[in-house]
Amino acid sequence: LLPVLQAEFGTLYLDEIDAAHLAMFYSKLRQTRKQSLYCCPKGFSIIMTDHGFTRNSLRTKAGVAESVITSAIRGQNIRPYSAEKIVSALGLPLSEVFCEISSEQYLDANTVLHYHRVMSSILQTAVTWGYIPDNPAHIVATPRKSNKPIKYLQPEDVIALIETMDRDHVPAKYRLALLALVLTGMRREELLATRWMDIDFTKGTLEVVQAVGYIRQKGLQIYDTKTTGSYRVISLPDCLLSEFKSYREYKDKQLEPIGLSVQDSDYLFQEADGHLLWPSSVTSWVRKFYSRHPELQRITPHGLRHTNASIQLNNHTPLPAVSETLGHTNSQTTAAIYAHVIQSAKVAASRQVDSILAPYLKNR
């Protein structure tokens, strides 16, 4: 987002950004093609080894996720900034390694709406700080959001997922990550930035204080959720607290032979070398796991967050409580995203009332 916003508004003072400018910007976005992608048709693994790299050493030098290197080896598409970092590490021109694949698709409505929300948030902060008198984004016609239905699992699908992971003896960190996502409703980036000190085992809570994000040219960065409105304290179910305790004991046993132990400042989820686990690594692992189990209902890590919300709403958890758990800025956001789930819950509640009172009314 940042490069696009800087190109459009970077030379303007805040009070020069008006509603007309914002409307024109959204119109341009709707006519913008999605970013082109790159692939390597020549056998990337040969290029890599010819230049003295292993998969891991190239990943480290280029500063990209392991899944990116895997995609390049398989001839799959990768993003431009990843391709640029890889060829920089190899010391080769971009055109010698990758071919550009132009996109024929335009930015969708949800992407344009996301730009609007970011600009509105920036301008509202400027109002709060007294730089401008009012927020011009409030009077611009809001880009319409696509009504594409969200995907989530039913409770029985969640149970099947857990049972299959246990039968497969999947890596402990990925098993716990998926359990935590579905039991807390956290965003993937928030969970991967969680430290042991953020969990209060006495109170049974988890404080969401930071998240991990990728910044071009800088790699993975940690940012404070208090600046994004996503800070919150989540109550943890007993079963997840138990899983966290078991995982910490497991990590302690791993470190014991070298005279170390888990520290409160450590992240829960780390690579073998101690670095932060890349968010894309979790998504890549989930994709591979489901490819081995076509019998399961497929879901993404973000879909597990939707699953948590749907379970709460279908069990009549008040909307403000669900919104707070998810870290939404207000209940309206939650209601808009989960409108279909809320409507289904209302129908179920109506039928429940009917099942209780109907026999009496019919016998009058």
What are the residue ranges of the model-derived segments?
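C-terminal secondary-structure termini that scaffold catalytic or DNA-interacting sites
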Residues: 203, 214-231, 235-240, 246, ...
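Hydrophobic (often cysteine-bearing) scaffold residues that line and stabilize catalytic clefts
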Residues: 18, 111, 115-118, 154, ...
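A short, basic/aromatic helix-end/turn motif that makes direct DNA contacts
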Residues: 60-64, 74-75, 91-92, 193-199, ...
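Basic, Lys/Arg- and aromatic-enriched nucleic-acid-binding interface segment
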Residues: 32-51, 78-84, 102-115, 128, ...
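Short, basic (Lys/Arg/His-rich) helix/loop patches that form interaction surfaces
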Residues: 34, 60-64, 105, 163-174, ...
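Catalytic-site neighborhood detector that most strongly recognizes the C-terminal catalytic loop/helix
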Residues: 73-77, 152, 211-214, 326-352
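DNA/chromatin major-groove-contacting recognition/catalytic segments
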Residues: 83-96, 100, 164, 216-223, ...
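Short, Lys/Arg-enriched alpha-helical recognition elements, typified by the DNA-recognition helix
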Residues: 1-127, 139-142, 265-266, 283, ...
